[in-house]
Amino acid sequence: PVHKIVAEYCAADYLIKRITDPVDVLTLTKCLPVIAPNGTARDELRGLLGWMAALGNRSVQESIIELDAYAVLANGDPSQLERSSKRQLLHRLKEIEAADPYFRRSDFWRRFSAAGFFTQDVVEEIKPLLTMGNEGHLRGLILELLADAPVNCQLAPELSLLTLNSNESEHIRTLASRCLLNIKEYDFIGALAVLIFEASNISLNIAAKIIEVAGPEKFNPTYLSGFLRVCANLYPDHKAQFERVVGTRYFIKKLISYFSQHTLELLLDELTHNLHCHCGKKSYECDCRNGISKIVGSMVDRYFELAQAPFDSVRIWQWIGNLNFHRQCQPDQSKSVQVLRENDTLRQGIITYVFGPLTDRKEIFNIRVEKFDGHLHSHSGLHLWRNDYKFILNLAFETDNVDLWTSFLVNHQRYKNREEQGPDDLRAQMRQHTLSKPAFMREWARF
């Protein structure tokens, strides 16, 4: 809280002025037994201790650093420390970690900024701390504080090594990559190649962040589509119902949100070109399109968020026609499902393109069942509504496509409740068709 920090600063300023006054009887030795009895700083007074070090002279700084080095770094303004005090602080923190690797304890999740602490005179002291291979808190703490430091460019080799090392923890690699992202001169192309080749969840997450910061428009669409194809391998098969960690692939959706409409169109064309099942299994068993279907589905959602009607129905079908899902999605969960269900013109444009040329009744039946009858594994927006049946019957009648018309013949609704029974507008429409063309009457009579 701000009021607490102000109170700590004012109290420290008052005490330091008295301690450094040669005629005042108050000394640091007299204050410490109250602030840190038995050499252990009170938790509620660690902020006061940190500000006293920041405002005090070299002697005061050295004494407080020896007492509680972490309090000096985490509180007050460590950038005000003298050069020798900064070095002493780093050495003292290293000693503390050697005795207690997890010295931050519950303070681990705290975030604070001390970027001004890292200046040219401490760069050489930092390098060995970054390259040590232990799992203590010190290295992570330093990386957190380095995020906005101006000396990152001098630490680029060490930071790059941490980022690209697959044996490092996710926490360390992520922090190191954030430091690299603040180096304007750093060449990320080589790092991206290593991260994408590793193809782990952590490495691809870092790579996605690099692409976000650099700007997706700076990358060739072929490069981006290749990256997304690698990301598709992160998705499990349909039998893996539960995952221990939720949201590990959220970075893919976040990256997609940075794509422009033009970039999305190019990527969707690239990713769905010649997309088909290559495992030969039934759609409910097929896992070879899981990842790419999820990614393309998210991209189509983003496309509909950006694009305005009218839409190119043929292109939309090419994007979503061969996707395979193992769960249905509702309109409030997916923008593409919402648009496809609400936009009759788009949906019926797709219907015209798909069914219009077909004359093989078996093929019509298979496409209808697998893609448009609310099938569990097709895109949830591809669903035929009652007005779509009317549209298809009229389309077939106008184009003299008897086979298509016959494939959508409507039965008598004999099993409806008595109060729901009555005239059927679809059958009435079909009867009108049969009165106009004998070919349709023959099928109607046979039916």
Where are these regions (language model features)?
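Charge-dense, extended regions
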Residues: 445-447
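Leucine-enriched alpha-helical scaffold segments used for protein-protein interaction
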Residues: 5-201, 216-230, 242, 254-258, ...
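Structured alpha-helical
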Residues: 440
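Intrinsic disorder/low-complexity flexible regions in very large eukaryotic scaffold/regulatory proteins
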Residues: 155-156, 188-192, 220-227, 260-271, ...
